[in-house]
């Protein structure tokens, strides 16, 4: 058997296999509804982006070390909400004080204000504040349907790819001295991304299947 040197890839073994299989059927149904124009399908996720640089490879002169200047912001970070409007191939990114029930409700209200006449469905993960009764009650008041992802299943969240893309463009080998500078970088990235709807559709791929070999490794 041929061997090669590989970097390990994290697999969340506690993800519930049965719930994941059911979600595959659900997401296929939701995508059909979105394609038919019956619902506006929106994926929502939160991320904590550090002001300090994410170090990585880049082109530099041979024989010279490549230095990335850092103002040493330490663990300073900004919480962002990210939205992927599947029907429109558009994304939204905005800062929040933190991820909690209040900011989740603000998110729902902003989404409804942006699409006042659409039948809305939001997919997000099972964070405790997403499941808070006041959040679910506000969603009902706003006539927003909520579909939670299975536990330990970030592979079903396309906004995870948005965060990777944003880090490549905004924090990769670049330190932001202030939160305001990082937020400005995120704003510029959002504008640039929304000029590339085809790239958004490809990069923010919505998972509609499971790898049987991977699912065997889960312990649930």
Over which residues does each language-model region extend?
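Conserved beta-strand termini and adjacent loop/short-helix elements that scaffold enzyme active sites
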Residues: 8, 44, 94-96, 125, ...
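RNase H-like DDE/DDD metal-dependent nuclease/strand-transfer catalytic core used by mobile genetic elements
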Residues: 53, 101-147
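C-terminal anion-handling pockets and recognition modules
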Residues: 37-41, 160-220
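Extended, low-complexity cationic-aromatic segments
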Residues: 21-109, 206-220
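Short, hinge-like loop/turn segments at secondary-structure boundaries
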Residues: 60-62, 140-141, 163-167
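RNase H-like polynucleotidyl transferase catalytic core
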Residues: 65-73, 141-161, 174-175
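Conserved short alpha-helical interface segments
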Residues: 1-15, 40, 47-49
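RNase H-like two-metal-ion nuclease catalytic core shared by retroviral integrases
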Residues: 17, 124-126, 133, 147-171, ...
């Amino acid at each position: 058997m041929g061997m090669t040197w590989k970097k390990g890839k994290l697999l969340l073994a506690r993800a519930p296999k049965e719930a994941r299989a059911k979600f595959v059927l659900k997401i296929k149904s939701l995508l059909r509804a979105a394609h038919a124009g019956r619902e506006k399908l929106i994926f929502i996720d939160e991320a904590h982006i550090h002001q300090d640089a994410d170090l990585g490879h880049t082109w530099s002169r041979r024989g010279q070390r490549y230095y990335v200047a850092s103002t040493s912001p330490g663990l300073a970070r900004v919480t962002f909400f990210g939205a992927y409007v599947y029907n429109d191939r558009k994304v939204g990114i905005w800062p929040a004080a933190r991820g909690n029930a209040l900011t989740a409700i603000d998110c729902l209200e902003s989404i409804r204000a942006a699409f006042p006449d659409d039948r809305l469905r939001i997919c997000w993960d099972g964070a405790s504040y997403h499941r808070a009764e006041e959040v679910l009650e506000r969603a009902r008041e706003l006539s927003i349907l909520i579909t939670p992802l299975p536990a330990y299943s970030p592979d079903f969240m396309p906004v995870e790819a948005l965060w990777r893309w944003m880090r490549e463009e905004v924090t990769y080998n670049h330190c932001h001295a202030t939160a305001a500078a990082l937020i400005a970088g995120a704003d510029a990235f959002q504008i640039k991304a929304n000029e590339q709807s085809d790239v958004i559709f490809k990069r923010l791929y919505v998972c509609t299947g499971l790898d049987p070999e991977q699912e065997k490794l889960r312990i649930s």
